[in-house]
Amino acid sequence: MGACTNSNYAMQYELPGTYAPIADFDLCRRAAEAAEKFGYNYKVGNVFSSDTFYTENAHNDKWINMGVLAVEMEAPALYMNAARSGNKALVICTVSDNILTGEATTAEQRQNSFTHMMDVAFSLL
């Protein structure tokens, strides 16, 4: 539901502290309800967003110990832009590759999981 980051994206807002980018609760609740209704496997929680997705010293174990579910690259910027413009936002991620194990989904698994993500997203409209 939130997005941790090592990016300096928030600096542009010149805030006197650290901004914690989060999803809109209503969108998150409705997306979880839709995933339940469709019978899809899903998780709700924090992601880690980085400007460098693959890096030699990512400290992934430390993020895992903090309960972070996945690594991606855009969530904080989306949440901050939405907050700044007075809009709601929700990041819905579909896991295709495991950067810890090297495991990757097949083309068929990827197609199905992306379709599931789109079903949930379209249900929010």
Positions of PLM-derived features:
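Glycine-rich phosphate- or other oxyanion-binding loops that anchor nucleotides, phosphorylated ligands
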Residues: 1-125
